[in-house]
């Protein structure tokens, strides 16, 4: 089981400046030394590198595009197998209603329970309906990761309307709720913690210096 507290997402895609398993492992080490209780990471290679640096549980994903599907976070059993081999403690996967490239969501949950009974499962959702469905399928954690990132939630953001979406998810599911997506300040982190989430994943605001720089530059432009 994940400990309660701050989970830091350490990810960089191939087109990003920090793309490197070595760099991700050092970001994870910095997060650990700063007090993070867990790491979220992408790819078997990154997870294995991170596990040589920190004694923290890892939420593992594999991002891979499939033609004809918008699902790209741990989309099929192929990615699940890679994550099982990585030794991550939690496997996260897209649990939205979007068209899947291969197995159904229920089939993937069954597959993980059969082949890795000691590994927990996290649902990345974008709507309350998806959260409720994931809860019914027996996910251990429900995360708000994809709010605003599906075609039917585009334009929405986790902190709008005083975190109304997060509050509704907390009210509707029995699984442990993880706040993730656009938690970009310590104040927001404190707010979602006070709402009763089990833990919170923060990524770009900590581990993506390009994104952080852009935020500062934009703030200066807005003032001019």
From Swiss-Prot:
Enzyme Commission code(s) on record: 5.1.3.9
Keyword line: Carbohydrate metabolism, Isomerase
Keyword Isomerase: yes
Keyword Glycoprotein applies: no
GO biological process, one term: N-acetylneuraminate catabolic process
Record field: catalytic activity: an N-acyl-D-glucosamine 6-phosphate = an N-acyl-D-mannosamine 6-phosphate
GO CC, any one term: cytosol
MF annotations from Gene Ontology: N-acylglucosamine-6-phosphate 2-epimerase activity
Pfam families to which the protein is assigned, alphabetical: NanE
Function recorded in the entry: Converts N-acetylmannosamine-6-phosphate (ManNAc-6-P) to N-acetylglucosamine-6-phosphate (GlcNAc-6-P).
PANTHER family: N-ACETYLMANNOSAMINE-6-PHOSPHATE 2-EPIMERASE-RELATED
The family this protein is said to belong to: Belongs to the NanE family.
HAMAP family: ManNAc6P_epimer
UniProt protein name: Putative N-acetylmannosamine-6-phosphate 2-epimerase
Source organism (scientific name): Staphylococcus carnosus (strain TM300)
């Amino acid at each position: 089981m994940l400990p309660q507290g701050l989970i830091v997402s350490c990810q960089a895609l191939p087109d990003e400046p920090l793309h490197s398993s070595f760099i991700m492992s050092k970001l994870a080490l910095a997060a650990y030394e700063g007090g993070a209780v867990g790491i979220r990471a992408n790819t078997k290679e990154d997870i294995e590198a991170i596990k040589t640096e920190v004694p923290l549980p890892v939420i593992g994903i594999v991002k891979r595009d499939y033609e004809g599907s918008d699902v790209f976070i741990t989309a099929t059993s192929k990615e699940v197998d890679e994550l099982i081999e990585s030794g991550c403690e939690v496997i996260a996967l897209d649990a939205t209603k979007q068209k899947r490239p291969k197995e159904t969501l229920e089939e993937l949950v069954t597959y993980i329970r059969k082949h890795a009974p000691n590994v927990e499962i996290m649902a990345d959702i974008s709507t309350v309906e998806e959260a409720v469905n994931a809860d019914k399928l027996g996910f251990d954690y429900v995360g708000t990761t994809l709010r605003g990132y599906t075609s039917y939630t585009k334009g929405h953001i986790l902190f709008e309307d005083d975190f109304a979406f997060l509050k509704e998810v907390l009210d509707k599911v029995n699984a442990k709720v993880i706040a993730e997506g656009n938690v970009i300040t310590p104040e927001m982190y404190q707010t979602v913690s006070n709402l009763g989430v089990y833990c919170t994943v923060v990524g770009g605001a900590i581990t993506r210096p390009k994104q952080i720089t852009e935020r500062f530059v934009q703030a200066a432009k807005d003032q001019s």
